[in-house]
Amino acid sequence: MQTYIATFFSHFGAIRFNKQLKELGLSGKLMPVPRRVSSSCGTCVKFEAESDTAVHSDDLEQLFLVNGEELTMLHSNI
């Protein structure tokens, strides 16, 4: 399993994404966006999945792979 952080254009998008994760049997955690990441919305979802293609959302702003303290951007809709 890989750990990811997803940012969103709106708080509602983050909540909806977290609900989608639960429906897929994945656990997500709503949390403040890390300071080193710029985002339209101040809320992100941290989650674990086998791959970044396991989930999709039209509200997704950016997707990062988490490796310890390092974040690698995988996708951006900015």
Regions found by a protein language model. Give the residues of each.
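A structure-centric signal for secondary-structure junctions around beta-strands
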Residues: 1-2, 60
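Amphipathic, hydrophobic secondary-structure cores in small proteins
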Residues: 2-11, 17, 22-50
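C-terminal structural segments of small proteins and small subunits
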Residues: 48-78
